[in-house]
Amino acid sequence: PLSEKQSGWDWFSLSLDDGVKLMGFQLRQTDGSTFSSSSWIEPDGSLTSYGNKEFVAKPLNLHTVGEKKLPTRWRLLLKDKNVDVTVKAINPNAWMNLSIPYWEGPVEISGSHSGRGYLEMTGY
């Protein structure tokens, strides 16, 4: 569950074509700030963790599903690994209007790296 000061989260789990895995998330705060963290996993299993603000997720456009406006295309940056990618929802209409509403679904990755992955978002 989110705290009273958090409005939602955006969670990315990406499998890059070179065998690397990138997991990153940001927690959106009610004051407009964010907290982010990520993990970079090499094909050999070695792990590098990144703290707040090293992983950057910026929405590029909003898609309307019902009465919700959802960011279904993102720019992700991880400067230490020269990552500058666009993440695009394969099915932008995948909003789940349940007791805790959320969006989740597969994504395509293009830019400095390519691949596929998964995105989950809440608080929209």
Predicted regions and their residues:
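Structured soluble/peripheral alpha/beta segments that form catalytic or ligand/cofactor-binding pockets
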Residues: P1-Y124
